[in-house]
UniProtKB/Swiss-Prot annotation:
Residues 40-43, 164-168 are annotated as: Interaction with substrate tRNA. Catalyzes the transfer of a dimethylallyl group onto the adenine at position 37 in tRNAs that read codons beginning with uridine, leading to the formation of N6-(dimethylallyl)adenosine (i(6)A). This is tRNA dimethylallyltransferase 2. The keyword Nucleotide-binding applies. Its EC number is 2.5.1.75. One of its GO terms (biological process) is tRNA modification. The keyword Transferase applies. Its cofactor is Mg(2+). ATP binds at residues 15-22.
């Protein structure tokens, strides 16, 4: 991915949740002619600020980020849309003589960007509406069984309670007559969002990308960061933020926005499903699981450059790696 020195440089700053990626990206932007592009599936939504650890408006004015606050929570934002938007913004950045710096931890977005999405069809609102109407009549277990009949490979990988993925698999089949697993095979893609590095090439991401991963050295330190950050979110008013979303009346837990880690647990708490203490436990546990998945994925990334979140000279360490990469590139 990064061995072609003729390609323009880009920086991919990844890492598990609560590792400090955003702060590092902003610090780097003080030293580099770069444009910040968010790679976060929750920060895309307006009104979902506290629970996504979104920088506040004053910070965003000082350090502008692309792909933040671009969707209403009722509107899905797909990995395909992210890829299109990110590639467009990266091209604009390079054309302006700057460096695109992508920062965030959403695995499926990086997968789409680096591996591509093949010829899988885009979402179709009419077909989705038909599937949702059927689900209301017969239930999602029946639709999962329907999926098993037309695409047993996908059905075996998709949990019967995962409504979004059942819907997408049926949608693809109805639009194309081909099972979703056909596209997985054609792409060399893994349905569990693990990257197949044999299929990553410059055609998918035509950049000389420097891969940076930020994380604490010790897992228990990351867990402590996660717990502390969620407590701070609660103190900042996350419960009120979620209550405002509930009061709208057009949002529900089936939407990708509301299913986001932290938001889903606070929403359920406000619905009376459990008490505050259990909500905190469930939210922090879900966030730890997210971080574990992110770390597992990052360990498989080739040419990864690890940075310690505990390093007192973190910015300098990152700048050394970036400077080395820029020196190896052709001039912009």
């Amino acid at each position: 991915m990064s061995d072609n020195k003729a390609l323009p440089p880009a920086i991919l700053l990844m890492g598990p949740t609560a590792s400090g990626k955003t702060d590092l990206a902003m610090a780097l932007s003080e030293r580099l002619p770069c444009d910040l592009i968010s790679v976060d599936s929750v920060m895309v939504y307006r009104g979902m600020d506290i629970g996504s650890a979104k920088p506040d408006p004053d910070t965003l004015t000082r350090y502008p980020h692309h792909l933040i606050d671009i969707r209403d929570p009722a509107e899905p934002y797909s990995a395909a849309e992210f890829r299109t938007d990110a590639l467009r913004l990266m091209e604009q950045s390079v054309n302006a003589g700057r460096i695109p710096l992508l920062v965030g931890g959403t695995i499926m977005y990086y997968k789409a960007l680096c591996q591509g999405l093949g010829d899988m069809p885009s979402a179709d609102e009419n077909v989705r509406g038909q599937i949702l109407a059927e689900a209301e009549q017969v239930g999602w277990p029946a639709l999962h069984e329907q999926l098993r009949q037309v695409d047993p490979v996908a059905a075996a990988k998709i949990h019967p309670n995962n409504r979004q993925r059942i819907q997408r698999a049926l949608e693809v089949y109805r639009l194309t007559g081909k099972p979703l697993s056909h596209y997985w095979a054609a792409d060399g893609a893994n349905p569990e969002n693990e990257l197949n590095w044999d299929s990553v090439n410059g055609a998918a991401l035509p950049y000389n990308a420097l891969n940076l991963a930020l994380a604490p050295v010790k897992r228990e330190d990351l867990h402590a960061r996660i717990a502390k950050r969620f407590q701070i979110m609660l103190e900042q008013g996350m419960i009120d933020e979620v209550e405002q979303l509930r009061r709208r009346g057009d949002l529900n837990v089936e939407l990708p926005s509301i299913r986001a880690v932290g938001y889903r647990q606070v929403w359920s708490y406000l619905e009376g499903e459990f008490g505050r203490e259990e909500m905190v436990e469930k939210a922090t546990a879900a966030t730890r699981q997210l971080a574990k998945r992110q770390m597992t994925w990052l360990r498989s990334w080739p040419e990864i450059n690890w940075l310690s979140a505990d390093d007192t000279q973190l910015v300098e360490a990152a700048m050394r790696l970036i400077s080395q990469r820029l020196q190896s590139c052709n001039p912009l």
